[in-house]
Amino acid sequence: MTRLSTCTYVQEKHNLIILGASGAGKTYLSCAFGIAACRNFYTVKYVRLPDLLNELAVARGEGIFQKVMKQYKRVSLLILDDWLLVPLSNTEARDLLEIVEARHKKASTIFSSQFAPAGWHGKIGEGTLADAILDRIVHDSYTIFIDGEDSMRKRKGIQA
């Protein structure tokens, strides 16, 4: 963790996969890595995957799709929270491939998910597309698994 907080993975264009149950602290840890990257003068963008997919769909309808895509392709560190909570449509999978391909070995991405990469293939859908996306993510990433009995919200929430 200490080594990752120095942002060498961003400098080397590697990714992080942060896995754990709901409330395990994946978002907290992702944001902490994002803050560390900002402090090291990297550009950072945080977005939940459902919000990203919605933004791309709206941008496509408004004729500004390429402009919006450029924002996600150029940032030094992109944090994708709630990665693959629900299955993707073919259009969404193609959009993600475009982002992942553009960033592969050129920029870093943090993928925060409740599901292990073995389950991602089924969520992406179409086999060839899923293979292309996962190949670019999994083989160039550090993986952090957060294990714990209780939800962070349960431990840190308001006590009666």
Predicted regions and their residues:
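Short, Asp-centered acidic motifs that coordinate Mg2+ and/or phosphate
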Residues: 77
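Conserved P-loop
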Residues: 1-74, 121
